[in-house]
Amino acid sequence: MDEIINKYQAVEKLFKEIQEGLAAYDQYKTLISELLHYNNHIKQEYFNFLMIISPYLIRAHSGETLRNKVNNEIKRLILVENINTKISKTLVSVNFLLQKKLSVDGVKTKNMWCTNNPMLQVKTAHNLFKQLCDTQSKTQWVQTLKYKECKYCHTDMVFNTTQFGLQCPNCGCIQELMGTIFDETHFYNHDGQKAKSGIFNPNRHYRFWIEHILGRNSEQELGTKQDPCGTKVLQQLKKIIKRDNKCIALLTVENIRKMLKEINRTDLNNCVSLILRKLTGVGPPQISESILLRGEYIFTEAIKIREKVCKKGRINRNYYPYYIYKIFDAILPPNDTTNRRILQYIHLQGNDTLANNDSEWESICMELPEIKWKPTDRTHCVHFF
């Protein structure tokens, strides 16, 4: 119990130190607000923990005969509540935020995803925080120019495309933006087409596909207005399985995709993992949060590199499950057969497309030190039976 309390106190001290150390810098406001979210979360968990154990502490001091019973009860609570996992999960997220901020500032850091020890994770976070402070101390001479603020009434100015600059909504002052070209296509729709945002977020695509590959998406995605729960689809698939004498335990992603094509429901190809779980009772492996975060970090870097090395003449369209397949094939050890089952739930495209993707992936790996390139092995499924 004392060990758990010490861990909570170490985490609280870490958050306080980071907040006080970075509060003076505007560029860290977003980072601090995200860290405060985790700080409030860990405080609530700590409060709940103390509320649970306090009655047992009172009983422990009431007599020697009750102490062993009380200690056993506290140990049971710690196991049931899974306190260590909650602390560790929070610290993994915090370390990811700090490491991501350092990478934005151009500072290279080592991957620190392997440990599940909360005290080591606190030490890691403290080291990352010190690197942030060192980076800031080297760039203190750099000043931030608040060019959007009106110099007369100090309110935020807005873009005025007709005047090619910023205009204050209060006093009407116009500030010309030197060296800036305004393209009307960024501000208006043409031919009834919807204007697209210029911000591309690889993390959104990663989370969408991970959710579907691991079968965590909503079961309502299988349904229609006439069949909200997707019962009809599952019944149709079961009829085909019975007709073809298929073994349910050996069903694969490709089997499900072929059956969906037969019943004209290829719109459910993204839900194959969920369908497999509903039919077989066995779902994809539950990958730990630290591995998923590491995969997200590498995925984001890979997409950025891909935009630079993309071959001319190829359609600018990514098949994101391929990237996820290659990343997890590389970061999961060969003997980790449990987690490597995730590869079974990722559909790979045809041989020609796969060869082109492998060639492109080789170029990406040359600039991605976390991944060592190797050709895609379609026979991965045989390694898990």
Curated annotation (Swiss-Prot):
Entry-linked InterPro entries: Poxvirus_VLTF3, VLTF-3_Zn_ribbon
Disulphide bonds in the chain: none
Record's keyword terms, sorted: Late protein, Metal-binding, Zinc, Zinc-finger
Highest rank taxon of the organism: Viruses
ZnF segments: C2H2-type: 166-190, 168-190
Gene Ontology MF annotations: zinc ion binding
Induction note: Expressed in the late phase of the viral replicative cycle.
Keyword Zinc: yes
GO aspect biological process, one term: regulation of viral transcription
Signal peptide: none
Family listed: Belongs to the asfivirus B385R family.
Protein name as catalogued: Zinc finger protein B385R
Biological source species: African swine fever virus (isolate Tick/Malawi/Lil 20-1/1983) (ASFV)
